[in-house]
Amino acid sequence: MTKRAVLVASFGTSHLDTLEKTIQPIEWDIAGRMPGRVLRRAFTSGMILRKLEERDGLKIDSVPQALERLAEEGFEDVVVQPTHIMNGEEFDKLMAQAEPYRARFRRLAFGRPLLTTLEDYRDLTAALSEALPEPEADTAHVFMGHGTEHFANAAYCQLSYMFHDQGRPDVLVGTV
């Protein structure tokens, strides 16, 4: 029987309550959609990993550590599913870190970030628009992202455009 796993890779968070309220439910949802696979977690942010270990004694694997552990435990079929929003710097880093492990598995597959195709943008803006109240005069809804020097920062402009294209000029997308 082939040992199969799904490795959910997130940027991470240093707030344990946020981990429980956001990342963990996403991991469980992904695992629920992939029966027969063992769920594992990895964070891509070295700063977050160090902070959690130093402050809380919580050891979470980096992507290379998690893949090494899976290989040592005899897993043959691994899907790496990022929780990243876009194909930016952290996703590029994840892919670069994972590539050397490809030969260690019979199959190493990768999911994609939330916003990869034009259809992804349409789906997300439609879902968020449905969750928002109807537009009102002098009212705006603001979604904030972290922002990046990476060319993927254009994803925020695309998201803003899609909201406006779908009749939601009251929705603003910005970065810090």
Which residue stretches match the model-derived regions?
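Active-site-proximal alpha-helix that buttresses catalytic centers in soluble enzyme cores
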Residues: M1-V176
